[in-house]
């Protein structure tokens, strides 16, 4: 089990993040009852004080709400993300602990360059690319790192 071994999400972190990303308290305009249920769901799903990315996605799916709403509640509660499906927020971002490939597959590289040139290199677009190419998000993220491309627009609002 992965331990969320990071410090608490504090006011300094919140200020830094909000200078880059403005989600607002309720970006999906959810009714107060739904927000209360969402807060409870996030609290109940915490693993060692953090919310695993796939669990955040599942909460959104189960509640039929946008993923960004889960991220906004996480910010409000001061909860950090763990287990990002693209490998962000880890020291070792490669899925291969011993010998990481030094070049991206031509198909993944072409897809990433196409997204980058269209200014659409986002988390959602990367997941669509993984479905289209029948690969994993980590492989696509690793290829982006190899190519020096930056993925943005986290569906939970983390980056």
Language-model regions, residue ranges each:
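Long, charge-rich, low-complexity intrinsically disordered regions
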Residues: 2-159
């Amino acid at each position: 089990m992965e331990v969320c071994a990071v410090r608490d999400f504090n006011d300094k972190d919140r200020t830094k993040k909000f200078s880059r990303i403005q989600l607002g308290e309720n970006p999906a305009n959810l009714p107060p009852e739904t927000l209360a249920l969402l807060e409870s769901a996030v609290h109940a799903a915490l693993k060692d004080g953090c919310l695993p990315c796939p669990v955040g996605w599942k909460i959104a799916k189960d509640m039929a709400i946008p993923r960004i709403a889960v991220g906004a509640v996480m910010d409000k509660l001061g909860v950090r993300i763990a287990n990002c499906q693209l490998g962000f927020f880890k020291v070792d971002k490669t899925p291969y602990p011993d010998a990481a490939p030094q070049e991206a597959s031509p198909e993944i590289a072409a897809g990433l360059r196409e997204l980058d040139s269209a200014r659409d290199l986002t988390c959602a677009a990367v997941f669509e690319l993984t479905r289209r190419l029948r690969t994993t998000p980590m492989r696509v993220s690793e290829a982006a790192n190899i190519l020096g491309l930056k993925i943005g627009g986290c569906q939970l609002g983390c980056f």
